[in-house]
UniProtKB/Swiss-Prot annotation:
Subcellular location: Cytoplasm; Nucleus
Boundaries of every R3H domain copy: 566-629
Record protein name field: Protein SQS1
Protein source organism: Meyerozyma guilliermondii (strain ATCC 6260 / CBS 566 / DSM 6381 / JCM 1539 / NBRC 10279 / NRRL Y-324)
Comp. bias regions, Basic residues: 1-10
G-patch domain location: 702-749
CC annotations in GO: cytoplasm; nucleus
Biological processes annotated in GO: mRNA processing; RNA splicing
Span list, region Disordered: 1-56, 153-265, 289-315, 327-353, 441-461
Function comment: May be involved in splicing.
């Protein structure tokens, strides 16, 4: 009873015990839903799951310390933003795009028409280029003009400064002369006046001529450097022209003449003046300035002569001016000689840089070792391998047919026939008639193209009713006329290939249709021999290509090339052993086999502790074997492998058809077997439909024992069998042959 009370008390939960029991019951209930241990741990951690932060960002998860809580970012994570509600995912859109692309590309061209739309504006790149070039030239001309004007202003300003200094010096000299004249006056001679006036007129005429020329050296040569030489000349002229006459008698002093200084100023000469991005040619041939800069200085000097004509400084000024003119002429001659030397040197360089031209094929004696008439080329096709549309008996096996021949084969052929390697370029240019490196000749092309200049010729082309040609359609009529005139050059000549007769090793050229040409026996034998050599060479090249593929398959472990038609079970085992002991290989692909063969490969892979996967579709479904961790831990199950070796031995590829020679050697020649069966002696009887069985059989003779017994029983010919009153039919039943599937009522005989 006490036990029952305790049991009831514990169940009902009176007092503390009951409360603990009820709480345990609730905990058990929660444990049934998900367990209380994880809930209690979550409560201890503040109600958060380990590894789940506030922002639900798995990319910010630290594997050692849990979620990162002190990161300031929005409430939506990258994962939630990438869902894009109401729209497809990025992967779905990618698949959809590729699907549409494949479907569009896979459609035939007739379902993808091309629509031509006439442009609103005419695109003429030549006009655009000309406009840009003209604009650039105008800008360059403006810049050059600005630079020239600024340079001229600078030079004039410098010259004005020099003139001011020169005037100052002359004033000082005049003052000194006046002092001397005050002390001892000098009378002038009338003859000296006449000489001075004549000299002045000559200088003015010379100045007018010189002002019409262009002097770029004056733009380059600063006048400041000329002051020293001028001062020296002035001092020299002063020493020679100015003297003190102690006597009281008047003297007639002619104007002093100073010889020109042969040594020019120490000025570097550059034929090209570079300012910024502009180059100005200082030679006399490229001048564009028509005004002289020094003209103002000369006029000033002439004006000053009127004021100081009474003194002897006039003679010195004229002498100085003549010396400057002579120096200017000598500098111009020097610059012209330098420009001529430069032009001569450039012409020599141009002539020396001319590269030698390749001699045309046929102008050397070594070019005649090969008969070029054996090869005829009408077209060239450029690509990965250049090809020539040629006709050659030894290459194509035909005298009339053109075939595409690779460039390598053509070069090998002609080099074997005697063409030198260094003459191959000129040889190919010769046989292609300039199609490879053809030089454009615009004049010849213009002569060949028909151009109609008036409307009457257009009416003749269109039969008297010429349509109105718009500006956009200019030249269409010319193209039509040219195509009509050049049609005859595109007409092909009807030719036929030389046929063959026989099969196998007896195959040869059929030369009967050339009997009308009465070919010699030697020519016929030569043609047949060349055809035989060509067939043998093609066969050897084909075999060589197959051997190369086989070698490549062996080197690259390509079983498709190694086993072209059939695999033996021992070959499969050898491939697995080689794959297992080669650490550099990770996978192995077998050729497509039938389902039983693929299942056998899967069993072998399992025995060698390898993974097997089926790839491909249809008849190209194959087994791919790869290594994994069990391959390196366990040894192969050779007991099961030996059991598989005792099963099916040969496996044929389903994607390749065996050659005729191979299956005849293994399975026999079914065609010949059928012919032998057909040619056996004795044929099976053939009865046509509707034939009466036994209709042509002879009557039973009287000597027959059965007939004799019937006659003894009372049977008479023409009567039925049986007793009187119960005789059978007198006519026997007729049996006819029925082969068709129609009913008996449809049969008509």
């Amino acid at each position: 009873m006490a036990r029952g009370n305790r049991r009831n008390g514990s169940r009902r939960g009176s007092g503390t015990t009951g409360s603990s029991g009820s709480s345990r019951g609730r905990n058990n209930k929660n444990r049934g839903r998900g367990g209380s241990s994880s809930t209690s741990r979550r409560a201890a951690n503040g109600g958060k799951r380990a590894g789940a932060g506030k922002f639900n960002a798995p990319e910010l998860m630290d594997l050692d310390f849990g979620a990162i809580d002190d990161v300031n970012m929005g409430t939506g994570s990258m994962r939630s933003l990438s869902k894009r509600p109401g729209r497809n995912t990025m992967m779905q859109e990618a698949f959809l795009t590729s699907k549409h692309t494949d479907r569009f590309v896979g459609e035939p061209l007739r379902k993808r028409p091309i629509e031509f739309i006439k442009a609103k504006e005419v695109y003429d790149p030549r006009a655009i280029l000309e406009k840009v070039i003209n604009k650039d030239e105008a800008n360059d001309a403006d810049e050059a003009t600005d630079i020239t004007v600024s340079l001229r202003e600078t030079t004039i300003a410098e010259q004005n400064e020099d003139n001011v200094n020169l005037d100052h010096d002359e004033n000082e000299k005049e003052n000194e002369k006046e002092d001397v004249e005050d002390q001892k006056p000098v009378e002038k001679d009338e003859e000296s006046k006449d000489n001075l006036e004549g000299l002045r007129e000559a200088i003015e005429n010379d100045e007018k001529v010189k002002s019409a020329k262009i002097d770029d050296e004056t733009l380059e040569q600063p006048t400041i450097e000329m002051e020293d030489s001028d001062n020296e000349d002035d001092s020299q002229s002063d020493s020679e022209g100015f003297f003190i006459d102690t006597s009281a008698q008047p003297t007639n002093s002619p104007p002093a003449y100073v010889p020109p200084n042969d040594i020019g100023p120490n000025i570097d000469y550059d034929p090209v003046l570079t300012i910024g991005n502009v180059q100005l040619h200082t030679s006399g041939a490229g001048n564009d300035i028509t005004a002289s800069v020094r003209s103002s200085t000369h006029h000033d000097e002439l004006d000053s002569l009127d004021e100081f004509s009474d003194s002897e400084s006039d003679e010195d000024a004229y002498a100085d001016y003549i010396r400057q003119l002579n120096e200017q002429d000598s500098s111009e001659e020097l610059s012209s000689s330098d420009s001529e030397n430069e032009s001569a040197s450039t012409d020599a360089n141009v002539s020396s840089t001319n590269s030698p031209q390749i001699v045309e094929y046929g102008f050397l004696s070594e070019d005649y070792e090969f008969d070029v008439s054996q090869i005829s080329v009408t077209n060239v096709r450029f690509g990965i391998k250049n090809q020539f549309y040629s006709r050659c008996l030894e290459l194509t096996g035909s005298v009339d047919d053109y075939m595409w021949v690779d460039e390598d084969d053509l070069i090998d052929f002609v080099t074997s026939k005697g063409v030198k390697e260094h003459r191959l370029e000129s040889f190919l240019s010769y046989i292609t008639n300039g199609m490879i490196n053809k030089t454009e000749n615009d004049e010849e092309e213009e002569q060949e193209v028909y151009v109609s200049s008036d409307s009457e010729s257009d009416r003749e082309i269109y039969g008297g009713t010429a349509p109105e040609i718009e500006e956009d359609d200019d030249g269409i009529a010319d193209l039509v006329a040219f195509s009509k005139s050049s049609t005859k050059f595109r007409d092909t000549i009807d030719t036929s290939a030389v046929g063959t007769t026989g099969k196998g090793s007896r195959k040869q050229l059929d030369l009967e249709r050339f009997a009308q040409y009465e070919l010699d026996d030697d020519i016929i034998d030569s043609l047949q021999q060349q055809y035989k050599i060509r067939r043998e060479s093609k066969k050897s090249k084909k075999q060589q290509h197959q051997d190369e593929l086989m070698e490549e398959g062996l080197n690259k472990y390509n079983l498709l090339l190694k086993y072209p038609y059939t695999l033996h079970i021992k070959d499969i085992k050898d491939e697995f052993e080689s794959f297992l002991h080669n650490p550099a290989r990770d996978d192995l692909s077998f050729p497509p086999l039938d389902p039983h063969g693929n299942k056998t490969l899967t069993k072998m892979a399992k025995c060698y502790n390898c993974k097997s996967a089926t790839q491909g579709k249809g008849i190209r479904r194959y087994i791919r074997v790869s290594k994994y961790k069990r391959t390196f831990k366990y040894l192969p199950d050779y007991g099961h492998i030996n059991a598989i070796l005792r099963q099916r031995p040969v496996f044929n590829r389903v994607d390749q058809k065996r050659p005729k020679e191979e299956y005849i050697a293994t399975d026999g020649n079914a065609t010949k077997d059928r012919i032998r069966q057909r040619n056996k002696s004795g044929h099976n009887a053939y009865i046509p439909e509707g034939h009466i069985v036994g209709g042509m059989a002879p009557e039973i003779d009287h000597t027959n024992v059965g007939r004799q017994l019937l006659e003894k029983l009372g049977w008479v010919k023409g009567e039925g069998l049986g007793a009187h009153g119960n005789k059978g039919i007198s006519e026997p039943l007729v049996a006819t042959v029925k082969k068709s599937k129609t009913g008996l009522g449809q049969t008509r005989y």
